[in-house]
């Protein structure tokens, strides 16, 4: 792969050339020079071949000669042509640019039909010969050109004018000046009658309305961008701590959007109708003591927060005679709001929409992060193209400087990592240490799962656990302490293994913490659906599971606050005051991300038993963001080994989709299809399984009349038929596969384009060397011709004297 050319031409100039840009005549001379060179090359092919062969022999004999010649050895004509190339003259002549766009606006105005905006060629320096500027003997002054351009811009439509101003290779100040001048029309409106060049009242009114709507749209767009949550905070975090820490907060923002979507569906179709038609309470409302905020029991039990509060009857129509003696049946001719069916369908549809959104987000993130295979040239792009010239405020410019500096640190650290390989002995020693540490971490995860199982069995067999409400917090507290302490133990063990890449270190820590969380959650799922269902026969076990998940979620938040207080704040104070060190703790990305995934998994597990649990998760995420942001800025330092987190968002979404969401979906499917609901509470109290609510609804529809006879057919052939489920799953997998193939194809195309750019660079070097060789041959021919002419013009007397001598 050839590197892009980067050199500076030292072109000899005459005193009259200084301070002047290239004129159309100079450009014409350049074109004529290239045409003459091509003709000379076609006429002297044989001589050129001999010269190339001789040059190849010289190159073979000398090992110090390279392909590209230094510019100090180029001839004056070659350097002048190189300096006049289009790539070297971009933006050199402002007057020529204005003339170019003036002629373009004239052509646009003279057309009968308005062209498409996509047909404009946004070339920075097109050939001025196309506009017949060299035929004008007296060039217009820059101010006259600008005034003509303003007049022509005023005659264009607003969209065309903005598009053309956007494409001009001028500075932002000049573009603003042209836009302000073109917004005040002083001539005759195009296509509008008028006398003496004065616009009519309708034209002025229409122009004012267009400007007002345009300004209103820009203001609304700026307001929407300003209303984006945590916009400035995320920029500040990314500038000070890099993309690795920023990926955690972006992932938290994504989880907030998922929970908001889930809560919207549950409120609209489950909690809203139930609040509108509240059931009768079984007894007097219990008194709230304040402990309910931690336990979720007490006065929260008989509310819309839990499964047991929802009725198993219709909500918007009086009942006729029961169909089976226990189920409320609507009268003939009506289609009531069936609460059991609405409860089950809403949970299923919300999970399906979450799955589609999650898969789409993961595929989009995968395409954005893995589309480009290599990062060659990214350093130059970051240096030359990262600055946003629209930034005018001092605080924003300082923040952008921090972002660019951190980005360069990450890129250089990644480049240095690729150029420092390990030896064979070092790799073997690293593999042995990795194996030992992995065994210890797996043993720790297995021990935590066994401890949770033993303690949960003890809680089931303990008689005082059912009588005291505070005892219900013991199991969540034990699980939370294990989730908090085990990652620290794994982090201590990870200090023994020498990781070259900080990215690999984070990925390994994420895998170990994920195994720990999965082991604990698997044990808890068996505890809830395998043990608690049998122990709580005759009671509302769904409410207990919902309260248990609420307690786990609240306890996880409390322990997170304590960990932030003692793990970051206290450690910083001790390090600075007692140990006299300036080192602050680093932000543990792996542990904090797995805490977010763990909390979101608890939310998905509890949606069926506590529909209001996503609201609790939203409040928790909001508090976590502000607590973590404050602690990060005050107590943490940037990573000592900067690294580029280009794929972290994709990895986080993948972990959220497959282990977390898929596990929660399997848990809920087992509860819907296999577990018998409680007979004393909830919308499915009279059914053997929750899934039978659909069949009961079909029987009600058949009794409701012929107007809705097609709905039982839809349920029978689309909902109960497993072929439809497999078909939808196959289509989803096919879409994912096609998206992956499209991304791979785009990567191949990008690689081919990069290779083509590299080949074009080599072609330029080859053509410049050929040009130099042609000029060298031409200079030698001129010198030999001059020598022959001098010999022929010598006096005959001198020749006679030489012969006599």
Curated annotation (Swiss-Prot):
The modification Phosphothreonine is found at residues 89, 105. InterPro entries: TMC (IPR038900), TMC_dom (IPR012496). The gene is TMC6. The modification Omega-N-methylarginine is found at residue 94. Acts as a regulatory protein involved in the regulation of numerous cellular processes. Together with its homolog TMC8/EVER2, forms a complex with CIB1 in lymphocytes and keratynocytes where TMC6 and TMC8 stabilize CIB1 and reciprocally. Together with TMC8, also forms a complex with and activates zinc transporter ZNT1 at the ER membrane of keratynocytes, thereby facilitating zinc uptake into the ER. Down-regulates the activity of transcription factors induced by zinc and cytokines. Expressed in placenta, prostate, testis, activated T-lymphocytes and lymphokine-activated killer (LAK) lymphocytes. It comes from Homo sapiens (Human). Interacts with TMC8. Interacts and forms a complex with TMC8 and CIB1; the interaction stabilizes each component of the complex. Interacts and forms a complex with TMC8 and SLC30A1/ZNT1; the interaction regulates zinc transport into the ER. The keyword Repeat does not apply. It holds the Pfam family TMC. Residues 231-249, 360-431, 491-505, 575-604, 672-722 are cytoplasmic. GO terms for cellular component: cytoplasm; endoplasmic reticulum; endoplasmic reticulum membrane; extracellular exosome; Golgi apparatus; Golgi membrane; nuclear membrane; plasma membrane. GO terms for molecular function: mechanosensitive monoatomic ion channel activity. Belongs to the TMC family. It is a multi-pass membrane protein. One of its GO terms (biological process) is intracellular zinc ion homeostasis. PANTHER family: TRANSMEMBRANE CHANNEL-LIKE PROTEIN 6, TRANSMEMBRANE CHANNEL-RELATED. It is found in: Endoplasmic reticulum membrane; Golgi apparatus membrane; Nucleus membrane. Glycans are attached at residues 103, 312. It comes from the Eukaryota. This is Transmembrane channel-like protein 6. Residues 1-29, 778-805 are annotated as: Disordered. The chain crosses the membrane at residues 210-230, 250-270, 339-359, 432-452, 470-490, 506-526, 554-574, 605-625, 651-671, 723-743.
């Amino acid at each position: 792969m050839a590197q892009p050319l980067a050199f500076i031409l030292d072109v000899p100039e005459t005193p009259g050339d200084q301070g002047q840009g290239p004129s159309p005549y100079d450009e014409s001379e350049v074109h004529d020079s290239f045409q003459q060179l091509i003709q000379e090359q076609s006429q002297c092919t044989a001589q050129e071949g001999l010269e190339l062969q001789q040059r190849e022999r010289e190159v073979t004999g000398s090992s110090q000669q390279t392909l590209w010649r230094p510019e100090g050895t180029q001839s004056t004509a070659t350097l002048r042509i190189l300096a006049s190339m289009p790539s070297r003259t971009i933006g050199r002549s402002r007057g020529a640019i204005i003339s170019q766009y003036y002629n373009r606006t004239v052509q646009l105005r003279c057309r009968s039909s308005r062209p498409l905006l996509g047909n404009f060629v946004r070339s920075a320096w097109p050939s001025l010969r196309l506009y017949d500027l060299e035929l004008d003997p007296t060039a217009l002054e820059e101010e006259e050109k600008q005034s003509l351009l303003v007049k022509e811009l005023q005659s264009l439509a607003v969209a065309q004018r903005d598009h053309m101003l956007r494409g001009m290779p001028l500075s932002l100040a000049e573009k603003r000046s042209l836009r302000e001048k073109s917004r005040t029309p002083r001539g005759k409106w195009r296509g509008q009658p008028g006398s003496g060049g004065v616009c009519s009242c309708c034209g002025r009114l229409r122009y004012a309305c267009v400007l007002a709507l345009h300004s209103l749209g820009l203001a609304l767009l700026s307001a929407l961008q300003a209303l984006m949550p945590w916009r400035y905070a995320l920029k500040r975090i990314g500038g000070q701590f890099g993309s690795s820490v920023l990926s955690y907060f972006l992932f938290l923002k994504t989880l907030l959007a998922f929970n908001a979507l889930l809560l919207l569906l549950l409120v609209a179709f489950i909690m809203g109708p139930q609040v509108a038609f509240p059931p009768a309470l079984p007894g007097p409302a219990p008194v709230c003591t304040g402990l309910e905020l931690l336990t979720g029991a007490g006065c929260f039990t008989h509310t819309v927060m839990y499964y047991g509060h929802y009725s198993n009857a219709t909500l918007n129509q009086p009942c006729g005679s029961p169909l089976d003696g226990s189920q409320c049946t609507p009268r003939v001719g009506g289609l009531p709001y069936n609460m059991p069916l609405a409860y089950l369908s809403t949970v299923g549809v919300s999970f399906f929409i979450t799955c589609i959104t999650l898969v789409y987000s993961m595929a989009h993130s995968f395409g954005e992060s893995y589309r480009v295979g290599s990062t060659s040239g990214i350093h130059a792009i970051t240096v030359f193209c990262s600055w946003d010239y629209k930034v005018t405020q001092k605080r924003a410019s300082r923040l952008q400087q921090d972002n660019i500096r951190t980005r360069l640190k990450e890129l250089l650290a990644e480049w240095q990592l690729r150029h420092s390989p390990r030896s064979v002995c070092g790799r073997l020693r690293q593999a042995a240490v990795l194996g030992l540490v992995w065994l210890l971490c797996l043993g720790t995860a297995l021990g935590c799962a066994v401890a949770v199982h033993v303690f949960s069995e003890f809680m089931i067999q303990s008689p005082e656990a059912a009588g005291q409400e505070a005892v219900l917090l013991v199991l969540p507290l034990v699980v939370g302490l294990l989730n908090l302490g085990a990652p620290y133990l794994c982090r201590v063990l990870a200090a023994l293994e020498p990781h070259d890449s900080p990215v690999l270190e984070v990925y390994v820590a994420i895998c170990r913490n994920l195994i720990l969380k999965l082991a604990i959650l698997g044990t808890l799922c068996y505890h809830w659906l395998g043990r608690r269902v049998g122990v709580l026969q005759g009671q509302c076990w769904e409410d207990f599971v919902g309260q248990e998940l609420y307690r786990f979620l609240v306890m996880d938040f409390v322990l997170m606050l304590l960990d932030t207080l003692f793990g970051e704040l206290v450690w910083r104070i001790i390090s600075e005051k007692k140990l006299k060190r300036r080192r602050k703790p680093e932000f543990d990305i792996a542990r904090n991300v797995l805490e977010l995934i763990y909390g979101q998994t608890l939310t998905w597990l509890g949606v069926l038993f506590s529909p209001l649990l996503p609201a609790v998760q939203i409040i928790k995420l909001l508090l976590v963001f502000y607590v973590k942001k404050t602690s990060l800025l005050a107590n943490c330092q940037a990573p000592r080994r900067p690294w580029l987190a280009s794929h972290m968002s994709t990895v986080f979404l993948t972990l959220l989709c497959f282990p977390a969401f898929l596990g929660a979906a399997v848990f809920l499917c087992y509860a819907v299809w296999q577990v018998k609901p409680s007979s004393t509470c909830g919308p499915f109290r009279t059914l053997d399984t929750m899934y039978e609510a659909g069949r009961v609804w079909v029987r009600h529809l058949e009794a409701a009349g012929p107007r809705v006879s097609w709905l039982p057919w839809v349920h029978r052939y689309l909902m109960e038929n497993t072929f439809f489920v497999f078909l939808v799953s196959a289509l989803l997998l096919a879409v994912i596969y096609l998206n992956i193939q499209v991304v791979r194809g785009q990567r191949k195309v990008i690689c081919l384009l990069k290779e083509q750019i590299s080949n074009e660079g080599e072609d330029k070097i080859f053509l410049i060397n050929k040009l130099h060789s042609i000029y060298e041959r031409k200079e030698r021919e001129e010198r030999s011709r001059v020598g022959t002419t001098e010999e022929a013009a010598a006096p005959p007397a001198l020749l006679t004297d030489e012969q006599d001598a």
